[in-house]
């Protein structure tokens, strides 16, 4: 007899699962937004894009000894060649404010709300 482990949580990938979008259009607008937000602080838009991609790649290979945030910023500043004071906070400001504009690049999935509610009603963490 096979014993099935109890499912305690359900993880959804927003990018295309619960939140329909054209990934390439979304990414283009995302990078335009964050690069424009950071540019006045001395990081050229293309540098911001390149360093963000490098940091993201480093997170994919994270061995778990550091948080993804730590790995990202360590890689970002290594690529930049210096550690700029306050850049992580300025980037966070974009996520609190400017990121909302990217909603226009996404669609709605009428089943998304139902899927999340069903998971919650069945005692699962989401």
Positions of PLM-derived features:
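Short, solvent-exposed loop/turn segments at secondary-structure boundaries
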Residues: 22-25, 64, 103
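Active-site neighborhood of HAD-like aspartate-dependent phosphohydrolases
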Residues: 2-12, 17-51
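A metal-dependent, Asp-based hydrolase signature
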Residues: 54-96
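Glycine-centered loop/turn motif at secondary-structure junctions
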Residues: 42, 81, 120-123
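A short, structure-level motif marking secondary-structure boundaries and short turns
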Residues: 19-20, 57-59, 99-102
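Asp-based, Mg2+/Mn2+-dependent phosphohydrolase catalytic module
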Residues: 1-10, 113-121
């Amino acid at each position: 007899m096979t014993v099935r482990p109890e499912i305690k949580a359900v993880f959804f990938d927003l990018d295309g699962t619960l939140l329909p979008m054209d990934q390439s259009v979304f990414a283009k607008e995302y990078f335009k937004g964050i690069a424009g937000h950071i540019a006045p602080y001395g990081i050229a838009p293309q540098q911001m894009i390149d360093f963000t991609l490098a940091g993201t790649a480093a997170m994919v290979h994270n061995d778990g000894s550091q948080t993804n945030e730590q790995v990202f910023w360590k890689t970002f500043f290594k690529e930049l060649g210096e550690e700029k004071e306050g850049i992580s906070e300025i980037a966070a400001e974009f996520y609190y404010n400017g990121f909302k504009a990217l909603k226009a690049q996404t669609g709605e999935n009428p089943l998304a709300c139902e899927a999340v509610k069903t998971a919650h009603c069945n005692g699962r963490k989401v």
